[in-house]
Curated annotation (Swiss-Prot):
Key words of the record: GTP-binding, Hydrolase, Metal-binding, Nucleotide-binding, One-carbon metabolism, Zinc
Binding site for Zn(2+): C118, H121, C189
Enzyme Commission number(s) of this protein: 3.5.4.16
Residue stretches of biased makeup (Basic and acidic residues): 12-24
Species annotation: Bradyrhizobium diazoefficiens (strain JCM 10833 / BCRC 13528 / IAM 13628 / NBRC 14792 / USDA 110)
Family membership: Belongs to the GTP cyclohydrolase I family.
Segments for region (Disordered): 1-25
The protein's name: GTP cyclohydrolase 1
Pathway as given in its UniProt record: Cofactor biosynthesis; 7,8-dihydroneopterin triphosphate biosynthesis; 7,8-dihydroneopterin triphosphate from GTP: step 1/1
Length: 229
């Protein structure tokens, strides 16, 4: 891990561009639940029938004993794996605390384990998120950063988009002086199919505010994330 993190170097002043949030990260969209309660969806029976069709497509006998309950189980698993579509990121960060005794440094929660699903192949990718923010007077409960990560992870994702969404949500709701997010993950769509490279890790990062503008703060964040392994 050390060698890979060292390759994520703090940006030089000449490299930095004016900060802008990608168009797809409109706060009105990514801070609300992705699926509205009144949004039409296929019935559960239709979802189970679709699973049965896929089983038939790969050549399975859908009537054999071991597969009779598989469509139901798969749909139930989807309800769990993709529950983030029905959860609101803004609500997770809504409650803050002002009793900080004048604390003026950044807050870092590292090694937040997560599992998500690649939107290209619908195969899992999993790893750890490291999140820091520098509060302005008020802080959020530490567990909320883990909950926020899970909400976005329990949707179809790319690692790049997941990283950007976490940072943008904290930036938009908490209005901190800066946010830093680093995600390291292994993608099964790369390890068990295609090139089949087991153990290959992907690192993505997103810096805003003081972390984006101050290479020393980026370096300090990366040093603390690297820590003792």
């Amino acid at each position: 891990m050390d060698a890979t993190i060292k390759s994520i170097r703090p940006s030089k002043p000449s490299d930095r561009q004016p900060e802008s949030r990608p168009a797809e990260l409109d706060p009105a969209e990514f801070l609300a639940a992705a699926v509205r309660a009144d949004q039409p969806r296929p019935a559960r029976a239709q979802a189970e029938a679709a699973v049965k069709t896929l089983l038939a497509y790969i050549g399975e006998n859908t009537e054999r004993e071991g597969l009779l309950d598989t469509p139901r189980r798969v749909v139930e698993a989807f309800d769990e794996l993709y529950q983030g579509y029905h959860q609101c990121p803004a609500e997770v960060l809504d409650r803050t605390f002002g009793e900080t005794a004048g604390y003026d440094d950044f807050v870092l929660v590292r090694d937040i384990e997560f599992t998500s699903q690649c939107e290209h192949h619908m195969m899992p990718f999993y790893g750890k998120a490291h999140i820091a923010y520098t509060p302005v007077e008020r802080v959020v409960g530490l567990s909320k950063l883990a909950r926020l990560t899970d909400i976005f992870a329990r949707r179809l994702q790319t690692q790049e988009h997941l990283t950007a969404q976490i940072a943008a949500a904290i930036d938009e709701v908490l209005k901190p002086r800066g946010v830093a997010v680093l995600i390291e993950a292994e993608h099964t769509c790369m390890s068990v199919r295609g090139v089949a490279k087991h153990g290959a890790s992907t690192f993505t990062s997103r810096f805003t505010g003081m972390f984006r503008d101050n290479p020393a703060e980026q370096a300090r964040f990366l040093s603390l994330v690297r820590g003792t392994r």
